[in-house]
Amino acid sequence: MAAAAERPRGGVRLVLGADAVIAAWVGSRIGIADFGPSAAIGIAEGGRLVAGVVYSAWRPSPGSLEMSVAALTPRWCCRRVLAALFGYPFGQLGAGRAQATVRRGNRSARRFVERLGFRYEGMARAAWPTGEDAAVYAMLRHECRWVGDQGSGIRCPIPDP
């Protein structure tokens, strides 16, 4: 992986500039083949990806996007990494809203996004790529406890659709 990396703690590193690789990795784990125009941040440990976030469906007005997350282990999840992952949409892009859509039956993923601070908004019938129902969660910028007003300083632009 010839991408830029930042080291937020111990052996965990942020991986930037490898959007396609990270998106394919995340997509293969959550069952999404194509995110469309997107950006991604990976989290690596020992030279391999252990987690990744894909930022897609960016709408400058009203300032919203979709965050898709996959992970092999919870060990990557610390305050400094979360500050970077949420600093990108809320700090750099100036988004006012981030959405996470989770397969209805994936209880562990639903608990995870709730612990991050996403709030349940409703069920989208047959909205998952497999035809299953999807739980829709969202977080507003002022609800995000992971970043201050300045964001993280991470720069990874989402291309215009």
Language-model segments: which ranges?
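Conserved GNAT acetyl-CoA-binding A-motif
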Residues: 91-102
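Conserved active-site alpha-helix within GNAT-family acetyltransferase domains
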Residues: 105-122
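Short amphipathic alpha-helix that is part of the acyltransferase structural core
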Residues: 1-30
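A short helix-loop-beta-strand connector motif used in the catalytic cores of GNAT acetyltransferases and
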Residues: 31-42, 62
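C-terminal "cap" of GNAT-fold acetyltransferases
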Residues: 127-159
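Conserved catalytic-core motifs of GNAT/GCN5-like acyltransferases
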Residues: 101, 119-134
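Conserved acetyl-CoA binding element of GNAT-fold acetyltransferases
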Residues: 61-73, 101
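Conserved beta-strand in the GNAT
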Residues: 48-57
